[in-house]
C-alpha cells in the first residue's frame, strides 16, 4: 500500500492513527460482547474504517454527516462519549433511542449526525435538503452522506444525484463499495466497471479512491472540502474496500470465496497504516504499546 503524507505534519499523522485505531478496538470488544450475549447484534465495519474516519476528520464539527450501519468511525470521530454509545448498543434507557433500538438507527443534533435509514437510499435525498439550506444561507458548509454499492441500484440514488447536480448542492456522496450487498456480489448488482462512472450521466465530478488508505482518503477530502467552499457542487466518491465480516455477525461469510478474503486481509487499513508510521519513525514502539 502506497501512503503519501504530502504536507501533513507528524502530529496529524499520529492523530489519524488514533482516530482509526479507536473504532477498531471498540469493534473487537463488540465481537466479544455479542458472543457473551451482552449485545444482540452487530454490523461490523472492520476493514472499512479509513473511509468514515477520514471523511469525519476533514469535516467541521458543525457540518452534517449521514452515516450507515458500519460507520462507527463517524461516531467516534465526533467524540460522542463511549458510555452513551455502549448504552445505545445494549438497549439501555440512557441510549440515544432509550432502548428502542440497539444499533446505529439514531441521530444526534448535538453532534450533527442524522440517523441512518435502513435501506440507505432515502438518506441521500435528506442530505440534499441539508445542503440546499446551507447553500441558501451561503455559509460554505459541506454535507457528507454515506451509502453502499447496493443502494446505488435504488431509485433514491438517481433522484438525489440528479437534483444535487442540477442545483449544484455541496454534497459529498460517499459510496462504500465493499464487494457485497447482503450476500450479493457486485457483478450481480450492476454492469458498469466503476460506480464513479455514474457521475458522468449527472454531469457530476467523481473520484475512485482506495478506501483502505487513510491518507489517500484524508488528503483527497481535504482538497475537495476547500474547493467546494469556493465552488459549491456535489461530488461522487467511490471508495473501494471490502467487508471482512458478515452482513451482520449472525450471517457469517460462507458465501465469500476464501481467496477473496485473503486478498483483502493483507490490505487491512489499520495494520498497514501502523506499519507505515513505524517505518517512517512517526510512531514509536512505546507509543504503540501504550
Regions found by a protein language model. Name each.
Residues 28, 32, 37-167, 185-191, ...:
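Cofactor-binding active-site loop characterized by glycine-rich and histidine/acidic residues
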Residues 113-290:
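Glycine-rich ThDP/TPP pyrophosphate-binding loop and its adjacent helix/strand module
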Residues 1-51, 57-58, 250-290:
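Conserved acidic/glycine
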Residues 3, 24, 96-100, 237, ...:
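N-proximal short alpha-helices
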Amino acid at each position: 500500500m502506497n501512503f503519501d503524507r504530502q504536507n501533513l505534519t507528524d502530529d496529524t499523522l499520529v492523530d489519524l492513527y488514533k482516530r482509526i485505531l479507536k473504532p477498531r478496538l471498540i469493534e473487537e470488544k463488540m465481537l466479544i460482547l455479542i458472543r457473551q450475549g451482552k449485545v444482540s447484534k452487530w454490523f461490523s465495519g472492520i476493514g472499512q474504517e479509513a473511509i468514515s474516519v477520514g471523511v469525519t476528520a476533514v469535516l467541521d464539527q458543525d457540518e452534517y454527516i449521514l452515516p450507515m450501519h458500519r460507520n462507527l468511525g463517524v461516531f467516534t470521530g465526533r467524540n460522542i462519549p463511549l458510555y452513551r454509545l455502549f448504552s445505545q448498543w445494549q438497549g439501555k434507557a440512557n441510549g440515544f433511542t432509550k432502548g428502542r433500538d440497539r444499533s446505529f438507527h439514531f441521530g444526534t443534533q448535538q453532534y450533527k449526525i442524522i440517523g441512518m435509514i435502513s435501506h440507505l437510499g432515502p438518506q441521500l435525498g435528506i442530505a440534499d435538503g441539508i445542503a440546499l439550506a446551507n447553500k441558501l444561507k451561503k455559509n460554505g458548509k459541506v454535507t457528507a452522506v454515506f451509502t453502499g454499492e447496493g443502494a446505488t441500484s435504488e431509485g433514491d440514488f438517481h433522484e438525489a444525484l440528479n437534483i444535487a447536480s442540477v442545483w449544484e448542492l455541496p454534497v459529498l456522496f460517499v459510496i462504500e463499495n465493499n464487494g457485497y450487498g447482503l450476500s450479493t456480489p457486485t457483478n450481480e448488482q450492476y454492469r458498469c466497471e466503476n460506480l464513479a462512472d455514474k457521475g458522468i450521466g449527472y454531469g457530476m465530478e467523481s473520484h475512485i479512491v482506495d478506501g483502505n488508505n487513510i491518507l489517500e482518503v484524508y488528503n483527497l477530502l481535504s482538497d475537495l472540502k476547500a474547493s467546494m467552499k469556493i465552488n459549491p457542487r456535489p461530488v461522487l466518491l467511490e471508495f473501494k474496500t471490502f467487508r471482512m465480516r458478515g452482513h451482520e455477525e449472525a450471517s457469517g461469510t460462507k458465501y465469500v470465496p476464501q481467496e477473496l478474503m485473503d486478498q483483502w486481509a493483507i490490505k487491512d487499513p489499520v495494520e498497514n497504516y501502523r506499519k507505515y508510521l513505524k517505518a517512517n519513525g512517526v510512531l514509536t514502539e512505546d507509543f504503540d504499546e501504550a
